[in-house]
C-alpha cells in the first residue's frame, strides 16, 4: 500500500506564475485582479490538485484554504462547460457542520460571479455553475429538486451523503469528480469519520473513475494519519507550508484571589457543579461566586471591540451567559441614560450603536434573563432554530451585532470577517479546539487572532494556562483513527444491501479500502454478517432480529427482514408462493430453505397450501 507523499513545512513552494499558468485565462485574470498573490497553501494545493493527486491541505485559519480546494474545480467548468441536458454534480463538498456548508455556499458566489463575468468579457462561453445544499435542514421538496436536477456543486454533510448513497438520490452522484472534505480533523479520529470513510468508498464504487479527494484542516496531528484517513489505500500529498499565523492569547482572572471571592454568591450562578458558594469543589473556599466578575468583565471587553464571539462549553452555559450579558448591558444603558437624561421615563436607554435589530427572540433562543429583548448578545447552538441561526450568523459576519455566545456550533471554519475578538469561558476542550475557536477572530490573511480565556476556578486556571501555552507553540493533540468499528460496518452493510444485492467478498474488499477498516479480520466481518443475518436471535433484544439474508453457498448478501418478502403481512388474503415453489427447493418457505443457519420468522400464519404439484 502506498503511503502519503508529504510536502514538508518549509519546502519551497511552486512559482506562482507556473501554477497560475495552469488555469484558464478567465480564472487566472479574475484571481490576479482580486488578490495580490496566492498564499503558500494555495500554491501547494493547486500544484497537487492540478496534477490529479489527492491532497490534504493543512494551514492556519485565514490562509485561503477554501479557495485552494475549489478554484481548480471551478476552473474545470470553464475548461469543460456542461452541455445542455447533461446536468450532473461534479464537485461534492462535505462539511461536518451545516452552518459551515451554508457559509461556503455564500463564499463561492464571488469567484463564480467573477470568473463568469471575466469569461463573458473575453468572449468565451460563459459557464453556468449552480450550487446546491443538502443537509438535515433541507426541506423535502428541495431534496427532490436536487435529485431531479442535480447542481454542479453539492454541499452536504457526512450523514446526508450516507442517505443519498442509500436512496435513489445516488444517481445524482454518478458524475462526481472531486470530493472536498472540510475540517477533516473534526471527523478523522471519530466513528463519524469511519462512517464517512466507508461512504467515500461506496461513492467510488458508483463511478467509472474514483474521485479526487481533497481534505482541509487548520489544526491536525499527525498529518500522515489524517492523510491515510482521507486516501484509504491511495497516496495523498500533504500540503503544509510553514505557518505565519500570529496569536494574541490572554488568560484572565477577574478577581485578585480565586480563593477569596468578595462577591456574594449569585442566584444566577452558571457553574455546572456549583455549590452554595458558586464554585465547583476545586475552588469553593468562601461563600462567593466567580461568575458576577466574569460577566462584568466580558461586557467590558465586548464594549471595547467591534464584534466578539464568546464560546461556552455547553448549551446551558451559553443560554444563561447570554441572558446575563444582556441584563448587565441593559442595566448599564439605563443607568447611563438616567444620568444623561434625569427627567426621562424610567427604563429609557440609549440605543445600541451597532444598530442591529433582529426579530423578537423566543424562549430558548436568547438566553435566560430578565425576559426583555436586547440587541447586545445572542445565543447560537444546535437547539436554536435554523432561521434564528442564520440571522445570528449573518449579523455576526457583517458586524451588526456586538456579541454572540456559542458552543462548538461556530467553532469550525465559518468566515466571520467582522469578529476581532474571541472569549473562551472555561478551558477549551482541547488545544485543537482552542485554535479553531480563537481562529474565528482575525480570520483574514495576515491578521492577528486575539483570544481571552476566563477560567472558573483554580483547577481550571491550570488547564487553561497549559492549553494556551500549547496553542502558542502549536502542540496539538494527536488523533487516532478508530480501528474496525463493527457497529459502523453493520450499519453500512444493511444500508448497502437495501440498495442492491452484494457479493460478500466484494463488500469486504470495499470496506477494507477505507482506513478505519484496513485491518479488519475476515473472521470479524463474518461475525457481523452472522449477527445481521439473525444467528443470535433473542426475545429480549428485538434489535437482534434478522436484517439481511446471507447466502453462504453463493456468497451473496440480500435485503432481509425489513425489505424482504418474508416481512410482508397477509391481511385477510392469500400470499402466493407459486413462483418460488417452481424453483425446486421444496417446502413452503421456497428458496429461503436453502440458506441454512439463517433464522427468520413469518409475519403470518399458514392455514393451508393449495395448488402444490406432486
Give the label of every model feature segment:
Residues 1-17:
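Interdomain "pre-motor" coupling segment immediately N-terminal to P-loop NTPase/helicase cores
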Residues 14-19, 23-29, 50-56, 60, ...:
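Helicase motor core with emphasis on the C-terminal RecA-like subdomain
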Residues 36-51:
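N-terminal pre-P-loop "Q-motif" helix
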Residues 65:
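Glycine-rich phosphate-binding P-loop
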Residues 108, 230, 566-575:
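Active-site-adjacent alpha-helix of alpha/beta-hydrolase-fold enzymes
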Residues 261-262, 561, 588-590:
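Short conserved micro-motifs at the rims of enzyme active sites and ligand-binding pockets
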Residues 558-568:
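Short, amphipathic alpha-helical interaction segments positioned at domain boundaries
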Residues 572-614:
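C-terminal catalytic histidine-bearing segment of alpha/beta-hydrolase fold enzymes
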Amino acid at each position: 500500500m502506498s503511503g502519503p507523499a508529504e510536502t514538508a513545512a518549509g519546502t519551497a513552494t511552486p512559482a506562482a506564475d507556473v501554477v497560475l499558468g495552469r488555469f484558464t485565462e478567465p480564472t487566472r485574470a479574475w484571481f490576479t485582479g482580486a488578490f495580490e498573490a496566492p498564499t503558500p497553501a494555495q500554491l501547494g494545493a493547486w500544484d497537487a490538485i492540478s496534477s490529479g493527486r489527492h491532497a490534504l491541505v493543512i494551514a492556519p485559519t485565514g490562509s485561503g484554504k477554501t479557495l485552494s480546494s475549489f478554484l481548480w474545480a471551478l476552473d474545470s467548468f470553464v475548461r469543460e462547460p456542461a452541455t445542455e441536458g447533461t446536468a450532473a454534480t461534479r464537485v461534492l463538498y462535505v462539511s461536518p457542520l451545516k452552518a459551515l456548508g451554508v457559509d461556503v455556499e455564500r463564499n463561492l458566489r464571488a469567484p463564480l460571479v467573477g470568473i463568469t463575468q471575466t469569461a463573458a468579457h473575453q468572449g468565451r462561453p460563459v459557464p453556468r455553475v449552480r450550487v446546491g445544499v443538502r443537509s438535515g435542514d433541507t426541506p423535502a421538496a428541495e431534496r427532490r429538486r436536487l435529485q431531479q436536477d442535480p447542481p454542479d456543486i453539492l454541499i452536504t454533510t457526512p450523514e446526508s451523503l450516507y442517505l443519498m448513497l442509500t436512496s435513489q438520490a445516488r444517481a445524482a452522484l454518478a458524475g462526481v469528480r472531486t470530493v472536498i472534505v472540510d475540517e477533516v480533523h473534526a471527523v478523522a479520529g471519530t466513528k463519524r469519520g469511519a462512517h464517512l470513510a466507508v461512504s467515500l468508498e461506496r461513492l467510488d464504487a458508483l463511478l467509472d473513475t474514483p474521485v479526487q479527494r481533497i481534505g482541509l484542516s487548520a489544526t491536525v496531528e499527525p498529518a500522515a494519519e489524517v492523510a491515510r484517513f482521507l486516501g484509504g489505500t491511495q497516496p495523498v500529498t500533504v500540503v503544509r507550508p510553514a505557518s505565519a499565523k500570529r496569536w494574541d492569547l490572554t488568560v484572565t482572572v477577574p478577581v485578585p484571589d480565586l480563593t477569596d471571592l468578595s462577591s456574594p454568591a449569585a442566584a444566577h450562578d452558571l457553574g455546572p457543579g456549583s455549590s452554595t458558594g458558586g464554585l465547583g469543589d476545586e475552588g469553593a473556599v468562601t461563600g462567593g461566586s466567580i461568575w458576577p466578575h466574569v460577566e462584568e468583565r466580558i461586557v467590558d471587553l465586548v464594549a471595547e471591540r467591534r464584534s466578539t464571539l464568546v464560546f461556552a462549553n455547553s448549551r446551558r452555559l451559553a443560554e444563561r451567559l447570554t441572558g446575563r450579558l444582556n441584563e448587565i448591558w441593559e442595566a448599564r444603558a439605563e443607568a447611563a441614560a438616567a444620568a444623561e437624561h434625569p427627567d426621562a421615563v424610567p427604563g429609557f436607554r440609549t440605543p445600541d450603536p451597532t444598530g442591529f435589530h433582529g426579530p423578537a427572540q423566543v424562549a430558548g433562543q436568547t438566553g435566560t434573563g430578565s425576559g426583555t429583548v436586547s440587541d447586545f448578545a445572542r445565543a447560537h447552538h444546535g437547539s436554536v432554530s435554523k432561521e434564528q441561526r442564520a440571522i445570528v450568523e449573518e449579523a455576526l459576519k457583517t458586524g451588526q451585532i456586538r456579541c454572540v455566545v456559542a458552543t462548538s456550533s461556530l467553532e469550525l471554519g465559518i468566515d466571520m470577517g467582522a469578529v476581532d475578538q474571541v472569549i473562551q469561558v472555561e478551558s477549551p476542550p482541547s488545544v485543537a479546539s482552542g485554535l479553531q475557536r480563537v481562529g474565528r477572530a482575525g480570520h483574514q490573511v495576515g491578521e492577528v487572532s486575539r483570544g481571552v480565556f476566563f477560567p472558573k476556578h483554580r483547577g481550571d486556571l491550570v488547564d487553561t494556562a497549559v492549553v494556551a501555552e500549547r496553542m502558542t507553540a502549536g502542540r496539538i493533540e494527536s488523533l487516532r483513527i478508530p480501528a474496525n468499528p463493527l457497529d459502523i460496518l453493520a450499519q453500512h452493510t444493511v444500508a448497502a444491501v437495501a440498495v442492491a444485492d452484494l457479493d460478500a467478498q466484494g463488500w469486504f474488499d470495499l470496506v477494507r479500502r477505507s482506513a478505519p477498516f484496513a485491518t479488519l479480520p475476515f473472521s470479524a466481518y463474518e461475525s457481523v454478517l452472522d449477527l445481521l443475518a439473525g444467528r443470535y436471535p433473542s426475545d429480549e433484544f428485538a434489535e437482534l432480529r434478522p436484517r439481511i439474508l446471507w447466502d453462504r453457498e453463493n456468497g451473496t448478501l440480500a435485503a432481509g427482514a425489513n425489505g424482504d418478502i418474508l416481512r410482508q403481512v397477509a391481511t385477510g388474503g392469500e400470499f402466493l408462493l407459486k413462483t418460488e415453489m417452481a424453483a425446486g427447493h421444496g417446502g413452503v418457505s421456497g428458496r429461503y430453505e436453502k440458506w441454512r443457519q439463517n433464522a427468520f420468522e413469518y409475519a403470518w400464519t399458514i392455514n393451508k397450501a393449495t395448488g402444490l404439484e406432486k
